[in-house]
């Protein structure tokens, strides 16, 4: 699901070849109507000569959207007499770079991921005057944003969405396994046990499921956290202290997962990262996997026969319901910036409907909507195979649920405690021991 590139791009881009196609077309479409807006903003430079802004964010999987963001930033800068630079880092390098900038300076605007607003709360400018109007005029925040975008009563970043995954599957192989409505994923509503049963038949036919359970930031927690919640367990209760992980229903759910892993999955997945399942799916090795729409976009470019045979379903549900692990991404301003007024002016402009809408639509559903207005946006109806992604925000929970997505939740995530609980269970075969281990690890973090 995730695209872990090495190094940063500044001035020129380095992208996977299969995503370069169509960039020009998207760029032209996204630019339509932008110039008049810029001319309105350019009546006179708003800031003193020599003002500079540096923006840091994670690299984009959808390359044309990254190109568009750079153009938007540069044109606003030219219209307002501000020199803007944009850096895009591979995802694992983003947080360390932000930490360095907090200490020594260097960036004005940074992209924050889940829990980072808590981590750097003393170093961020309150931007409620930008975020709240954006949310209100667009129908309010989606659930996952509402749960996480504030630290107490402070708004320390402006939410712009989240990229997430669903269950990609091969239509023909699900048909062979007897799955009803296999040709239309939007009509399929499965429990985990039903999903495992289909996988068992697919594996018997030589087409196992695939799931990454290694130390990787996207796909492993993207399945393990929702599965945990769907069987009634949580890291902590609402008080943010009481461990709620070792529950009988979850232990039983883990037993079902162990059985499903053996019956339905490629068992080498315990060592897979976010890229292994992409390759396995695109090579025809597996019939279904949790992944972002990146697999589908890649297939449309390089493997059209696989794209034609691919659809998506919502993540399965358990006895406690259906859940998605979603964390809010925000654009934040560092307090040590020497150009806070310019940074706020840029964000206020970028989050206007025209600029934000063009950027969000250019990703064709890869980025989930942060506000409710975009639930009915035409982009969701261009390709029926993307329909399940539109529904995900209503099921979103954050890391650390039912407590806040704070530093402790981020630490538990970074240590892969929930993911390793699943890996230990399928490797050792003892659900109870694995869950007890996970609960003990969580106590060490939340008990501090």
Where in the sequence are the language-model features?
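Hinge/lid segment of periplasmic solute-binding proteins
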Residues: 44-47, 112-166, 196, 223, ...
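Long, aromatic- and glycine/proline-rich binding clefts that accommodate carbohydrate-like moieties
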Residues: 47, 52, 310-313, 362-420, ...
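Extracytoplasmic/periplasmic solute-binding protein
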Residues: 152-160, 165, 193-243, 249, ...
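Glycine-centered hinge/linker elements that transmit conformational signals in sensory
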Residues: 194-202, 239-271, 315
């Amino acid at each position: 699901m995730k695209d872990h590139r090495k190094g940063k791009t500044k001035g020129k881009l380095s992208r996977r070849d299969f995503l370069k196609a169509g960039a020009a077309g998207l760029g032209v479409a996204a630019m339509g109507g932008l110039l008049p807006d810029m001319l309105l903003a350019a009546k006179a430079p708003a800031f003193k000569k020599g003002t500079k802004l540096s923006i840091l964010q994670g690299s984009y999987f959808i390359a044309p959207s990254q190109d568009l963001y750079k153009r938007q930033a540069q044109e606003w800068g030219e219209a307002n007499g501000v020199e803007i630079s944009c850096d895009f880092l591979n995802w694992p390098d983003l947080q360390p770079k932000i930490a360095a900038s907090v200490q020594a300076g260097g960036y004005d605007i940074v992209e924050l991921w889940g829990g980072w607003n808590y981590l750097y709360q003393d170093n961020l400018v309150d931007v409620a005057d930008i975020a709240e109007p954006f949310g209100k005029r667009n129908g309010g925040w989606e659930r996952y944003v509402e749960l996480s975008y504030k630290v107490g009563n402070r708004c320390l970043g402006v939410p712009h969405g989240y990229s997430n995954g669903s269950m990609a599957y091969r239509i023909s192989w699900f048909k062979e396994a007897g799955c009803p409505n296999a040709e239309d994923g939007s009509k399929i509503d499965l429990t985990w046990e039903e999903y495992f049963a289909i996988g068992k038949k697919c594996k018997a036919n030589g087409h196992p499921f695939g799931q990454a359970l290694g130390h990787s930031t996207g796909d492993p927690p993207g399945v393990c956290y929702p599965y945990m919640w769907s069987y009634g367990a949580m890291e902590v209760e609402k008080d943010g202290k009481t461990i709620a992980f070792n529950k009988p229903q979850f232990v039983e759910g883990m037993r079902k997962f162990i059985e499903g892993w053996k019956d339905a999955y490629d068992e080498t997945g315990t060592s897979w990262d976010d890229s292994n399942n992409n390759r396995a799916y695109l090579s025809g090795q597996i019939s279904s996997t949790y992944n972002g729409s990146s697999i589908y976009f890649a297939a449309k470019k390089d493997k059209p026969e696989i794209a034609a045979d691919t659809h998506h379903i919502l993540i399965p549900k358990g006895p406690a319901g259906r859940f998605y692990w979603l964390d809010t991404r925000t654009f934040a301003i560092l307090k040590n910036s020497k150009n806070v007024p310019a940074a706020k002016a840029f964000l206020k402009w970028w989050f206007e409907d025209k600029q934000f809408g063009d950027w969000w639509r250019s990703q064709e559903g890869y980025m989930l909507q942060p506000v409710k207005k975009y639930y009915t946006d035409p982009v969701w109806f261009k390709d029926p195979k993307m329909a399940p992604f539109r529904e995900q925000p209503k099921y979103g929970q954050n890391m650390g649920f039912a407590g806040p997505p704070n530093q402790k939740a981020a630490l538990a995530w970074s240590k892969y405690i929930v993911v390793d609980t699943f890996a230990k269970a399928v490797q050792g075969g003892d659900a109870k021991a694995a869950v007890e281990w996970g609960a003990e690890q969580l106590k060490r973090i939340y008990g501090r």
